[in-house]
Amino acid sequence: MKLRFISSALAAALFAATGSYAAVVDGGTIHFEGELVNAACSVNTDSADQVVTLGQYRTDIFNAVGNTSALIPFTIQLNDCDPVVAANAAVAFSGQADAINDNLLAIASSTNTTTATGVGIEILDNTSAILKPDGNSFSTNQNLIPGTNVLHFSARYKGTGTSASAGQANADATFIMRYE
């Protein structure tokens, strides 16, 4: 009986010893990003990095300079606004300007697919004012209220010639905020 108990205890100790072995290996790196701002509002995370889908259009729509696609709305949300710090907010966009019409964003060359030609992307504010992508053309000021504020914009394709060619028609722009 005593031998059986010792054998059972020894077996249990061996199982416990093998089950407690742990290996420590490198798992990777996590990069945390953020920013503290001394401003009237903070830009909502979803607004800081967004995709505006302009859609798919036939090339024959752009058979004259200035022809446009449908306006596609998008917003920039501001959080934790304090109108005592600043009463108004405005936005300016910056990106590669179209070579023919510098009021438009240039269509970026695509490495894996064909790039569309004959159009650029026009950005407008909530008053339909065109926002040149130069980082200096600010939207109309919007009065800030305490808390959350939503700034409204729209974008569309605009013809730069008398014809367009099919392909990807993408562009990137950054934006800056001005508080007054």
UniProtKB/Swiss-Prot annotation:
Biological processes, Gene Ontology terms: cell adhesion; cell adhesion involved in single-species biofilm formation
Localization recorded for this chain is: Fimbrium
Enumerate the SUPFAM superfamilies for this protein.
Answer: Bacterial adhesins (SSF49401)
Keyword terms, alphabetized: Disulfide bond, Fimbrium, Signal
Q: Residues of the signal sequence?
A: 1-22
Look up the record and report any one GO term of the cellular component aspect: pilus
Q: What induces it?
A: Expression is negatively regulated by H-NS and subjected to cAMP receptor protein (CRP)-mediated catabolite repression.
InterPro entries, per this entry? Adhesion_dom_fimbrial, Adhesion_dom_fimbrial_sf, Adhesion_dom_sf, Bact_Fimbrial_Adh_Pro
Superkingdom classification of source: Bacteria
Q: What intrachain disulfides are recorded? A: C41-C81
Note the Pfam families from the entry: Fimbrial (PF00419)
Phenotype reported upon loss of the gene: Deletion of the operon under classical laboratory conditions does not result in any major effect on E.coli capacity to form biofilms compared with the wild-type strain.
Q: What does this protein do?
A: Part of the sfmACDHF fimbrial operon. Could contribute to adhesion to various surfaces in specific environmental niches. Increases adhesion to eukaryotic T24 bladder epithelial cells in the absence of fim genes.
What's the miscellaneous note? The operon is cryptic under classical laboratory conditions, but is functional when constitutively expressed.
Q: Which family does it belong to?
A: Belongs to the fimbrial protein family.
Q: What is this protein called?
A: Uncharacterized fimbrial-like protein SfmA
Q: Which organism is it from?
A: Escherichia coli (strain K12)
Query: Top-down, what is the taxonomic lineage of the species of origin?
Result: Bacteria, Pseudomonadati, Pseudomonadota, Gammaproteobacteria, Enterobacterales
The gene from which this protein is expressed is sfmA
